[in-house]
Amino acid sequence: APSGGPLVQHALQALLDMVKAGKMTLEQLVQKSAHNTATLFQIEDRGYIREGYWADLVLVDLNKPYTVSKANILSKCGWSPFEGHTFSSTIEHTFVSGKLAFSNGQLIEKGAGERLLFNR
């Protein structure tokens, strides 16, 4: 059976919908999803936009709705509980370790990431 995390692809969009609904600020979203993760797991050189850190960035159009369909699911499992749901934002580009990994709905460079290093 194919594996894959069916929630991962749309996690940021789900959180951005919470921002739009006033449940948290954009700053809180960044704190909880990037900064706290890097700090909690003691991941070296990630989770912040700082000189010398890896550029893991997502560029989002906050005003462009995105509907999840079977055709645009990238997870290996091939399904999502969000299928048919329309999010208020669209992920335009994703950079992993400074390399363009996703652009305009398409994976660009498979395996663009670098091995994580931990301070523990």
Identify what each model region corresponds to.
Residues W54-L117:
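C-terminal cap of metal-dependent C-N hydrolases
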Residues R120:
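A cross-kingdom feature strongest in bacterial/archaeal respiratory oxidoreductases
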